[in-house]
Design a protein with these regions (language model features):
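Boundary at the C-terminal end of the N-terminal hydrophobic targeting segment
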Residues: 12-14
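Exposed acidic/Ser/Thr-rich ligand/metal-binding surfaces
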Residues: 97, 119-207
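…and closely analogous acidic/polar surface helices at protein-protein or active-site interfaces
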Residues: 70-79, 86-116, 126-133, 150
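Surface-exposed acidic, glycine-flexible loop patches that form ligand/cofactor-binding
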Residues: 45-48, 71-72, 102-106, 160-169, ...
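Acidic/histidine-rich, surface-exposed loop or edge segments in extracytoplasmic proteins
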Residues: 36-37, 76-85, 117, 134-142, ...
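Structural recognition of the beta-strand scaffold that forms the well-ordered cores
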Residues: 79-82, 112-116, 174-177, 205-210
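Acidic, polar low-complexity linker/tail segments
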Residues: 17-18, 22-80, 86-93
């Protein structure tokens, strides 16, 4: 099933509804089956039955999504990490730290894919659940300040890789793109180019992370 974040759902989820909160919402396209991650006051997952009973209303654009088919979102996730390594070594070091933290927090069946964007975009780690392999790939990232990213090419490569290997990649997929805040053109192009291909055509959530100088 193709999983997509509901566009109507707030980015910073966790809005309290009764005695539980909605942490994350996905919708299966085109069937429009709804999946949620909801927790109680102690942060423990709760049954979808409670979400349905609370009368939660969901909308995709102007269309109301029926909530009678709500289910628990507990399938593995593939984290597609797109790193703009055309930054300096100091910034890339910050990226490595953040990526290692993400990898260490992933579920046992969650996958990591890693792309570098400097110059010609390349997949340096195909989808894997191997935490050690993912950390080693992150540690091996090198700064290539002289090579500007080709973001249109990068978006196409990411889309094609996911599309061609769709069945072997985890059911839920999300792209994390890391870029520098100072490079506005890069950040904007990443959001536009990647969203156009991988995010919209594959119905994948997209997050852009940028670094900011103190």
């Amino acid at each position: 099933a193709v999983m997509a974040a509901l566009l109507c759902a707030p980015k910073a989820l966790g809005t309290t509804i009764g005695e539980f909160s909605i942490e994350q919402i996905y919708v299966n396209v085109p069937e429009l089956d709804v999946f949620v991650q909801a927790t109680d006051a102690q942060g423990q997952p709760i049954s979808p039955d409670l979400v349905r009973a609370a009368g939660v209303e969901l909308y995709l654009g102007d269309e109301k999504i029926p909530t009678g088919n709500i289910g628990m979102a507990n399938e593995p996730i593939c984290y597609v990490l797109a790193v703009d390594n055309s930054v300096d070594e100091t910034t890339l070091k910050e990226y490595r730290i953040a990526l290692r933290r993400l990898i260490s927090a992933k579920g046992a069946k969650d996958q990591i894919m890693l792309y570098t964007l400097a110059g010609d975009a390349a997949c340096v780690l195909p989808a894997t659940i191997d935490t050690r392999a993912a950390v080693n790939a992150v540690n091996a990232l090198e700064s290539q300040e002289e090579n500007e990213p080709n973001l249109v090419q990068a978006a196409t490569i990411i889309y094609n890789d996911i599309n061609e290997n769709y069945q072997s990649i985890a059911p839920r997929k999300v792209i994390f793109a890391l870029s520098e805040a100072g490079n506005t053109a890069t950040s904007t192009a990443l959001l536009g180019a990647v969203a156009k291909d991988a995010a919209s055509r594959l119905n994948m959530p997209l997050d852009i992370f940028v670094t900011v100088d103190d």
